[in-house]
């Protein structure tokens, strides 16, 4: 039924295209919109790319093309259309910069997913300084470094960002890194915690670093605080590991693990 409706739609559009003088773009835009509404992304992309060839300056075609490229995670396509979006006043300079950063982050995350570390390094090095200093770009790059086992390179990048601002995401990543000077790393994280003592992410990070430093009693207290302000399955797991190291009872440890597992399986487990 849906296929027949789509075929009828296409035949009507072909007829309109053949009989409407000078309305190629209008008919093409309607066709692309209908294809998008039907989630026919590849067909819509082909239609819009053709329309761009026919009318390179058409602002609405450019806008639809950019939105579709973004939706399909075709980040190079987004970058290719950006200059025209600016020239045709579809986006102002701020919008162009935001979209450019989003596209660069998308490219870096795609390369990370493929474990294409050479491309990750290239994307990072070629990105403008302002883009590298953005939270989203830096967080994605830090994740990539951690996955490569290069956490020691990531640490200073997080610290430099945190000296100027705040990021729950980067604070969280800092707890997944272990630098050579663990005591200094812990002291730095505790300083951040003192400024944001009700933030579950910094509390989780400090708890992790205390555990790594074998300060288990303090780690337990901080992890319990983190759960108080923002319960997460991951935090319960860390707490259970600390309780195990402290020699707590099997019953107590199991109960904590169960709470964490229940939270992970529910839809209420907050994500960073």
Report residues per predicted region.
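Single-residue signature of alpha-solenoid repeat helices
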Residues: 8-9, 44, 78, 120, ...
């Amino acid at each position: 039924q849906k296929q027949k409706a789509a075929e009828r739609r296409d035949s009507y559009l072909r007829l309109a295209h053949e009989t409407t003088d000078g309305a190629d773009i209008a008919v093409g835009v309607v066709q692309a919109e209908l294809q998008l509404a039907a989630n026919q992304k590849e067909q819509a992309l082909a239609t819009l790319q053709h329309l761009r060839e026919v009318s390179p300056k058409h602002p609405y075609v450019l806008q639809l093309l950019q939105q579709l490229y973004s939706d399909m995670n075709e980040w190079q396509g987004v970058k290719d259309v950006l200059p025209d979006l600016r020239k045709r006043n579809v986006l102002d300079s701020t919008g162009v910069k935001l979209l450019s950063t989003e596209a660069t982050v998308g490219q870096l995350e795609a390369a990370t997913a493929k474990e294409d570390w050479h491309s990750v390094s290239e994307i990072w090095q070629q990105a403008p300084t302002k883009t590298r200093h953005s939270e989203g770009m830096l967080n994605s790059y830090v994740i990539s470094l951690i996955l490569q086992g290069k956490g020691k390179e990531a640490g200073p990048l997080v610290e430099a960002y945190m000296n100027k601002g705040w990021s729950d995401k980067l604070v969280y990543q800092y707890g997944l890194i272990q630098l050579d000077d663990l005591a200094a790393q812990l002291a730095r994280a505790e300083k951040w915690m003192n400024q944001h003592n009700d933030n579950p992410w910094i509390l989780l990070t400090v708890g992790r670093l205390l555990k790594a430093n074998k300060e288990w009693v303090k780690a337990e207290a901080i992890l319990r605080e983190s759960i108080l302000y923002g319960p997460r399955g991951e935090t319960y797991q860390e707490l259970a590991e600390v309780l195990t190291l402290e020699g707590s009872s099997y019953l107590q440890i199991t109960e904590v693990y169960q709470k964490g597992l229940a939270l992970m399986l529910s839809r209420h487990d907050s994500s960073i």
